[in-house]
Amino acid sequence: MTEPSLPRVGTGVDVHPFEQGRECWVACLLWPGETGLAGHSDGDVASHAACDALLTASGIGDLGAVFGTGRPEWSGASGAALLGETARLLAEGGWLIGNVAVQVVGNRPRMAARRVEAQEAMSAALGAPVNLSATTTDGLGLTGRGEGLAAIATALVTRV
């Protein structure tokens, strides 16, 4: 049976705790003066959630399977590098990326002033449109207490 060429949607989530002494990379941008995020790579929750959503939508796998701690070659990798490799994997698998929407959840860094710059950086790294928004949890949970940062992403892909 031939699979219909309908669009597919994937969701991705990523959460990292803050870690003193690390640079803060979120949405492919360096945030000077902000505490960095712990992680196997750069801790860029926005890029990681976007990759996870794309990998899920395409059925290739998930962030942990493709870039996880069992893959030492990705240790310390940038969110931009992960987005680029994810785009390559999808293209190799016959997928076209429609777009990705990412919402960053946390108190810091404040995304509003650099939102357009972040969208442009993520879109350039991925080679497809990325839209970004941000919110807080009004003091609730680990992001509300300022212990870390989270991101949720939705991706749309279609077969080429």
Curated annotation (Swiss-Prot):
Site (Transition state stabilizer): 40, 136
Keywords: Isoprene biosynthesis, Lyase, Metal-binding
Top-level EC class as recorded in UniProt: lyase
Phosphoprotein among keywords: no
Family: Belongs to the IspF family.
UniProt: a divalent metal cation binding residues: 14, 16, 48
Keyword Metal-binding appears in the UniProt entry: yes
Entries under InterPro entries matching the protein: MECDP_synthase, MECDP_synthase_sf
Cofactor: a divalent metal cation
Binding-site positions, 4-CDP-2-C-methyl-D-erythritol 2-phosphate: 14-16, 40-41, 62-64, 135-138, 145
Chain's role: Involved in the biosynthesis of isopentenyl diphosphate (IPP) and dimethylallyl diphosphate (DMAPP), two major building blocks of isoprenoid compounds. Catalyzes the conversion of 4-diphosphocytidyl-2-C-methyl-D-erythritol 2-phosphate (CDP-ME2P) to 2-C-methyl-D-erythritol 2,4-cyclodiphosphate (ME-CPP) with a corresponding release of cytidine 5-monophosphate (CMP).
Protein name per UniProt: 2-C-methyl-D-erythritol 2,4-cyclodiphosphate synthase
Single annotated GO MF: 2-C-methyl-D-erythritol 2,4-cyclodiphosphate synthase activity
Catalytic activity: 4-CDP-2-C-methyl-D-erythritol 2-phosphate = 2-C-methyl-D-erythritol 2,4-cyclic diphosphate + CMP
NCBIfam families to which the protein is assigned, alphabetical: ispF
